[in-house]
């Protein structure tokens, strides 16, 4: 699928990506991404035309802030149908989250594809800035490996966010197999395997548990209404 999406891309290029609507990319985040690209000459940033008008503005801004070489390594594709969107998310090597307003459903889609997601809860008091960290923790196994991976992918500051991105992406390498496909090596490849192995048992994708919890909450809400009781219902 990588060849279908990016037929001219060399096999050793690392694909950084974000599939959010473009309004979530505010200036501070975009500057961070440009600095990350500048430190990773064998990388691209994959964004969506979401909306199409945003592409021209971001390209113009990238050229003004970081120069033509970096700006030319930002690649836009059209928004895909849902099934294709989830499938092709695995082509991305590292998803760079938007700290101001995180990926929500998109984060779950990306993690289902087993693509590592780097996030920064920029504002502890804003739920939309903490969401991806919570989703990520829900996708990871409750093991030492899972907890370690969470500490690596949940940054504590802008500087740490950029450093982690450069470290993880810079440590990824590919070698071509006899069948003509690239095989990844490095910490990002290890993270992808952990996400793949863990998603069948993790809480985030345990649909049966979600349904059971919601049904229990509905029953409890009805019971409280009949009894004239109030209060939060915790799932």
Q: Predicted segment positions?
A:
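Residue-level signal for the nucleotide or nucleotide-sugar donor/cofactor binding architecture
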Residues: 28, 156, 209
């Amino acid at each position: 699928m990588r060849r279908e999406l990016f037929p001219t891309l060399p096999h050793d290029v690392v694909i950084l990506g974000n599939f959010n609507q473009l309004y979530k990319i505010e200036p501070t985040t975009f500057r961070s991404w440009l600095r990350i690209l500048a430190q990773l000459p064998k990388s691209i940033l994959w964004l969506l035309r979401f909306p199409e008008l945003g592409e021209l503005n971001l390209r113009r801004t990238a050229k003004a802030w970081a120069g033509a070489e970096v700006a030319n390594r930002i690649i836009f594709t059209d928004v895909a149908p849902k099934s294709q969107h989830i499938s092709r998310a695995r082509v991305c090597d590292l998803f760079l989250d938007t700290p101001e307003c995180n990926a929500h459903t998109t984060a779950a889609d990306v993690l289902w594809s087993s693509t590592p997601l780097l996030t920064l809860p920029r504002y502890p008091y804003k739920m939309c800035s903490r969401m991806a960290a919570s989703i990520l923790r829900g996708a990871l196994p409750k093991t030492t490996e899972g907890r370690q991976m969470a500490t690596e992918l949940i940054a504590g500051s802008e500087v740490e966010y950029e450093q982690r991105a450069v470290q993880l992406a810079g440590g990824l390498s590919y070698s071509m197999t006899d069948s003509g496909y690239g095989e990844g090596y490095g910490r990002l490849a290890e993270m992808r395997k952990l996400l793949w192995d863990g998603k069948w048992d993790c809480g985030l994708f345990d649909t049966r548990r979600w349904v059971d919890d919601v049904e229990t909450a509905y029953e409890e809400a009805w019971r409280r209404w009949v009894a004239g009781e109030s209060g939060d219902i915790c799932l």
